[in-house]
Amino acid sequence: MSKLPMDADILPPSDDRIFKVLLTHPDAKRVLIDIISVVIDQNVIDVKIRGNEVPVMDIDEKNERFDVNCTIDSGDQVDVEMHSCRQAEIGSEHTNFINKYVYFLTDLHSSQKSKKVIYRNLVKTYQITFCMYNILPSTADFVNRFSLRTENNLQLTDQINIIIIELGKLNKALKKPVEELTSFEKWSLFLRYAQEPMQRKLINDIIKCKEEIGMAAALLQEISQDEHERARIRSRKMYEMDQYSNLHTSELRGEAKGREKGRGEIIKLLEKGYSLEEIKKMLEIN
């Protein structure tokens, strides 16, 4: 088993770019098979990755393109991805994330060859997303599975399947003895904490009891020594920070313009003889 050195500077497998590089490594087939088997709860024998490479300069579409699209021995389609950066949302319902998620899942399912194929013979499609931030705040479970069901929980079909793994909800797993962890919990802890020196002992204990995670750890060490990958991560982080900074600046400018406009409206109403109480009601000011 390849333990991670206690002082090693390990790149985070929770970074969407590193996640894809790890799972598509020529020596990572057993790793990918085991992750898919654990997540969809099936004994997967073989997996074939389908090409969906990201253009070198296509940084802006990373959340849509840094996925691992593959088929398994049953013929079913599986798309695996990592979301490391929170998407911009209006409100707290993550509607943008979920709608995009459903859009690409149904697009993948409908991409099957249907000519001269009986609909009952269409294969299943799985969308698996590991996420570094919480999408479903109403549940404490870190794994949530979705398919088409009625409001009474009667399943219509298992043709399309959504599985969301929220890596920010692993507190219970962190408190368990390693020997009591499920394979799903072990993989999730590895993907979330492999890069953190404070959790290195835990990760190495997990590596000792699961061979495929040991293989992933060895590959992750190899990837972490690649200066090209480190440069790409630095470049992407700078880009993301610039994006956040520009967004924050735009928000501040918008707030300033809003305050200026509000003051102008109040002055006009005062000039027309309205009282402050009347103005508060008109402008819905508390």
Over which residues does each language-model region extend?
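Elongated, amphipathic alpha-helical interaction scaffolds
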Residues: M1-N286
